[in-house]
Curated annotation (Swiss-Prot):
Gene3D superfamilies cross-referenced by the UniProt entry: NagB/RpiA/CoA transferase-like
Gene: lutC
Protein name, per record: Lactate utilization protein C
Origin organism lineage: Bacteria, Bacillati, Bacillota, Bacilli, Bacillales
UniProt-listed InterPro entries: FTHF_cligase-like_sf, LUD_dom, LutC, NagB/RpiA_transferase-like
Protein family: Belongs to the LutC/YkgG family.
Function according to Swiss-Prot or TrEMBL: Is involved in L-lactate degradation and allows cells to grow with lactate as the sole carbon source.
A GO BP annotation: lactate metabolic process
Length: 236
């Protein structure tokens, strides 16, 4: 359904009047950018160079980075989970857990160690929020990873909602290396291309830069007020 724009002409006429001129209704062209810093920044960096930028930025945002491989990911995840108090754990319902060989870790190995593991259920909205609220650890995959700011981008879908990323005490993000891009520009360009190709845009897109950081008027840093106390990134 196409939306309706109400009172547009009156609004634009008033702006033109305040500018002291007649309203322009034709011959208007989008101005050429004087600077392309949004595109030029880090554009010639290799994946390894972007990774170094990303890791350096993570030290500034109080985020631990674990470099791992497909073969070591299960072991590294289990170690970090146990070091951070175990469960309850809340996972996104994401096929990538199976693709990365993690299904048995969460279905068998961790439960044998008395670690409670739950998976986001698309049929239980309120139930999911309660699980997220009580979760010690939330785990999800990054859809885009921004080197410049140390940011992961996660898109809401039926298998994960916003609360999965913000309510658990500890947040673990699994980052496939191919998701690493220089900055927000490239991530948004790709999202836009997908929408133009017919994909439906996510109802909520979250840009997460480390754990929750807040500062009061005296610039005293407080961690965990609006989200997780700790964030750990696994680069695979």
């Amino acid at each position: 359904m196409t939306g309706l724009i109400q009172n547009r002409d009156a609004f634009l006429d008033n702006i033109a009047k305040e500018l002291g001129r007649a309203r322009k209704t034709e011959g208007v062209e989008r101005p050429v950018w004087k600077s392309n810093v949004n595109i030029e920044t880090l554009k010639d960096y290799s994946q390894e160079e972007l990774l170094e930028v990303f890791k350096n930025q993570c030290t500034n945002i109080h985020t631990t980075v674990v470099e791992t491989t497909n073969e070591r990911l299960r072991e590294d995840l289990q170690q970090v989970i146990m070091e951070n108090g175990g469960g309850p754990i809340l996972l996104s319902a994401d096929e990538r857990f199976d693709a990365y060989g993690l299904t048995s870790l969460f279905k068998e190995e961790l439960p044998k160690r008395d670690v409670e593991v739950n998976v986001w259920d698309p049929e239980r909205k309120d139930g999911n929020m309660r699980l997220a609220e009580k979760a010690n650890i939330g785990i999800a995959f990054s859809d885009y990873t921004l080197a410049e700011s140390g940011t992961i981008v996660v898109q809401s879908h039926k298998g994960q909602g916003r609360s999965l990323h913000f309510l658990p005490t500890v947040y673990l993000a699994i980052i496939p290396r191919e998701t690493l891009v220089p900055r927000i520009t490239q991530a948004v360009q790709d999202m836009n291309s997908r929408v133009e190709d017919g994909e439906t845009a996510a109802s909520c897109i979250n840009f997460i830069t480390g754990p929750s950081n807040s500062a009061d008027i005296e610039m005293n840093l407080v961690v965990g007020v609006h989200g997780p106390l700790k964030a750990i990134y696994f680069i695979v």
